[in-house]
């Protein structure tokens, strides 16, 4: 859809919202969440939903967090919200190297009354985001809609906007767009057109587009600051990253400010400096062979090596993630396998039918995989007697319900275009992650029923020498060498979520400072892995990388085209790092309901 079509869609969207509430019941008040959900109903593309979601909706809702219907576009705050939506279009549909259309204004933008070939979105910033008070009245006047005016519902094929010419209800696209998109309309989203690079546009890594700070017109990104604080904590500030033409970005272009780095009078480090600085500190730990205690399965005999269980018998979450990202669906065989694992987890199969031999005892010990946060281990979920321990591990029935829901939501979004279900998918998927690996930012582990992939080039400490030549699989946890670059470069080799889990429970990450830095590593590793399809030693393993819409909308066609895809990572990581209370509450509710 071209810029003209998108501008018309914005206008049509607000008109439909206004129209649907022109006869509100007495004292009808809708919360900003309800209106926001309705707004998303009218938006076709996932990246648009993500972009609008990053806009300043809280500002629109005012202090009481509520607004009255119909839309009061005479209200300056609501006009600002409209402008924020247009701002998203400006940032995502910017053109460079074209002749500006000097006399454009907000009214012409909304009406689509301009020549798109001559139009430069950059010019609009001085109008829709005015710094000059003289432009304020003009901007508001252009955006006002008579809210008291009641019009009959338009016919199906057209919508009339306050004396203006009718707008077709179908998407208004150029001929070239229609040719490209005609074969893809059946999907929830479409592959976005590559856009020209514009060095004046800066895309915030966590979602909201902003003007380059060097420019004269800057839209305050309050939501970006809020998300940054929620994800990383108040001590970390994620700066802006220049938008490339296509593909991935270099991590060295970002600057991170960590509050604790003020101790040496240095406020800003680029990513390499941050890594080097932490490497120096972690090397000190590694050279002294400092180990990290992890709840482990104690062998009955110290001479018995605890073998890693067979990979085929364990739940391969990484494969599941990749399948969902690439095709947006889960196959019946996978569901059956997951159900089998849950059944095994729920019953008595962890220690069963093993011969009384060294090998049998090793297998039996290795499969005692249910471990609570306190390090206690049980043969299976049903073997847990204490109520306090029971609540630390979700009932397998909940896991099975999540799996069923996940499949249902995936199918409905992909096949039936139920766009609002995308949020539910993200929630269900993140809940599943929390069930499997616990809260990632609490340094606690609820259950450990996965296997580390067999990787030959695992960085280890010097104490690993005693394990060389053995058949015990990967070295013990405390012998794996931890450095930031290890995290960055080994992400593709190792189970993604297992890496996050290990970092979260690593005692060397126990301080707020280290935890914040760890989250930076995770964010950058995700970005590097997904945005760079030719990441060394990983392309052959994982194949082409889909966009982050694979996490939040489970699309089947979207491929990364530019940094705007990072917008989809923000809510995902936000949920990942705030799962603790949600999962714990679900566990407590489930335990209470089952009479435990």
UniProtKB/Swiss-Prot annotation:
This is Structural protein precursor VP8. One of its GO terms (cellular component) is viral capsid. GO terms for molecular function: peptidase activity. Coiled coil: none annotated. Signal peptide: none annotated. GO terms for biological process: proteolysis. 120 subunits of the putative clamp protein VP8b appear to stabilize the capsid shell. Keywords: Capsid protein, Hydrolase, Protease, Virion.
């Amino acid at each position: 859809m071209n810029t003209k079509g998108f501008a018309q869609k914005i206008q049509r969207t607000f008109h439909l919202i206004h129209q649907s509430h022109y006869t509100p019941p007495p004292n009808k008040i809708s919360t900003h969440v309800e209106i926001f959900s309705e707004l998303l109903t009218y938006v076709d593309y996932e990246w648009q939903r993500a972009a609008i979601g990053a806009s300043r909706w809280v500002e629109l809702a005012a202090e009481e967090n509520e607004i009255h219907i119909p839309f009061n576009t005479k209200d300056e705050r609501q006009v600002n919200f409209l402008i924020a939506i247009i701002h998203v279009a400006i940032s995502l549909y910017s053109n460079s190297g074209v002749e500006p259309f000097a006399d454009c204004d907000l009214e012409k933008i909304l009406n689509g009354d301009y020549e798109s070939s001559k139009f430069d979105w950059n010019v609009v910033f001085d109008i829709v985001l005015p710094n000059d008070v003289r432009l304020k009245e003009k901007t508001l006047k252009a955006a006002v809609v008579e809210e008291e005016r009641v019009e009959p519902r338009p016919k199906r094929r057209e919508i009339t906007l306050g004396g203006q010419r009718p707008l077709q209800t179908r998407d208004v696209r150029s001929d070239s767009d229609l040719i490209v998109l005609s074969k893809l309309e059946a999907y929830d989203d479409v592959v976005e057109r590559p856009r020209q690079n514009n060095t004046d546009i800066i895309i915030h890594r966590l979602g909201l587009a902003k003007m380059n700070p060097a420019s004269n017109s800057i839209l305050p990104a309050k939501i970006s600051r809020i998300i940054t604080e929620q994800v990383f904590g108040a001590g970390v500030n994620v700066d802006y990253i220049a938008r490339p033409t296509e593909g991935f970005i270099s991590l060295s272009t970002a600057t991170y400010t960590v509050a604790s780095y003020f101790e040496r009078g240095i406020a800003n480090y680029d990513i390499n400096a941050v890594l080097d600085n932490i490497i120096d500190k972690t090397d000190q730990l590694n050279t002294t062979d400092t180990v990290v205690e992890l709840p482990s399965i104690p062998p009955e005999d110290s001479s018995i090596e605890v073998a890693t269980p067979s990979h085929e018998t364990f739940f391969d979450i990484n494969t599941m993630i990749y399948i969902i990202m690439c095709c947006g669906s889960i196959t019946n065989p996978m569901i059956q396998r997951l159900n089998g694992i849950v059944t095994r987890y729920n019953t008595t199969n962890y220690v069963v039918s093993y011969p009384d031999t060294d090998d049998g005892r090793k297998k039996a010990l290795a499969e005692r995989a249910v471990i609570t946060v306190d390090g206690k281990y049980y043969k299976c979920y049903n073997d847990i007697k204490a109520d306090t321990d029971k609540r630390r591990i979700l009932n397998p029935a909940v896991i099975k319900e999540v799996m069923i829901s996940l499949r249902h939501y995936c199918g409905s979004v992909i096949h039936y275009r139920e766009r609002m279900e995308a949020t539910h998918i993200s929630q269900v998927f993140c809940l599943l992650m929390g069930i499997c690996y616990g809260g990632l930012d609490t340094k606690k582990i609820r259950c450990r029923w996965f296997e580390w992939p067999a990787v030959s080039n695992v960085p280890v400490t010097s104490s690993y020498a005693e394990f060389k030549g053995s058949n015990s699989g990967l070295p013990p946890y405390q012998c794996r060498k931890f450095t930031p670059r290890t995290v960055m470069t080994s992400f593709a080799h190792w189970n993604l979520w297992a890496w996050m889990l290990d970092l979260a429970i690593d005692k060397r990450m126990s301080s707020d400072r280290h935890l914040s830095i760890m989250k930076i590593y995770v964010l950058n590793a995700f970005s590097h892995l997904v945005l760079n399809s030719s990441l060394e030693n990983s392309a052959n393993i994982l194949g082409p990388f889909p966009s982050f819409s694979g996490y939040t909308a489970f699309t089947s066609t979207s491929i990364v085209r530019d940094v705007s895809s990072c917008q989809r990572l923000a809510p995902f990581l936000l949920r990942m790092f705030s799962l603790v209370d949600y999962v714990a509450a679900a566990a407590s509710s489930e335990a209470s309901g089952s009479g435990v």
